[in-house]
């Protein structure tokens, strides 16, 4: 069964979102997603300072099985990317909720972020999506 930490929010596209500041979140793929992908061999990260629309494809993860788009879970600016994945894409498989994070997004308004995060799935809701 896939690990689904209670302190994160989730999308139906198998991404997790962790608030790391009043207006900032960190994004990655879930344990379920990495297990479905198989061995990750390449990660294409978004450009820093890029403005992303909610639901927009902004990154790609390539595995031995397939290539998967990664979507922005909310409208925001990309403010950091995990450069370590360029040299060690397998980190996504080994530690999807820690060292395998993909990028960080920042919004202008903390209250709006509260609302947006509230609209994402909690751990139980995500377990329902993956049949857990």
UniProtKB/Swiss-Prot annotation:
Q: What is the lineage of its organism?
A: Bacteria, Bacillati, Actinomycetota, Actinomycetes, Mycobacteriales
Show the PANTHER family listed in the entry: GLYCINE CLEAVAGE SYSTEM H PROTEIN, GLYCINE CLEAVAGE SYSTEM H PROTEIN-RELATED
Q: Which residues carry this modification: N6-lipoyllysine?
A: 65
Every copy of the Lipoyl-binding domain together lies at: 24-106
Give a short account of what the protein does. The glycine cleavage system catalyzes the degradation of glycine. The H protein shuttles the methylamine group of glycine from the P protein to the T protein.
Q: Which cofactor does it need?
A: (R)-lipoate
Give Gene Ontology CC terms: cytosol; glycine cleavage complex
The record's cofactor note says:
Binds 1 lipoyl cofactor covalently.
User: What Pfam families does the annotation carry?
Assistant: GCV_H
Q: Name one GO biological process term.
A: glycine decarboxylation via glycine cleavage system
Q: Which UniProt keywords apply?
A: Lipoyl
The family assignment reads: Belongs to the GcvH family.
Per UniProt, subunit arrangement is: The glycine cleavage system is composed of four proteins: P, T, L and H.
- Does the keyword Lyase belong to this entry? no
Highest taxon of the source?
Bacteria
Its recorded name reads Glycine cleavage system H protein
């Amino acid at each position: 069964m896939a690990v689904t930490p209670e302190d994160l929010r989730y999308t139906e596209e198998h991404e997790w979102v962790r608030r790391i500041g009043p207006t900032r979140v960190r994004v990655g793929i879930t344990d379920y997603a990495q297990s479905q992908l198989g061995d990750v061999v390449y990660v294409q990260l978004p450009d820093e300072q890029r403005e992303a629309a909610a639901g927009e494809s902004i990154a790609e993860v390539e595995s031995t099985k397939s290539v998967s788009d990664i979507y922005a879970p909310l409208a925001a600016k990309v403010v950091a990317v995990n450069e370590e994945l360029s040299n060690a894409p397998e980190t996504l498989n080994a530690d999807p909720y820690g060292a395998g994070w993909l990028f960080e997004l920042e919004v202008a308004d903390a209250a709006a972020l509260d609302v947006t995060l509230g609209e994402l799935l909690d751990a139980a809701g995500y377990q329902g999506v993956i049949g857990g």
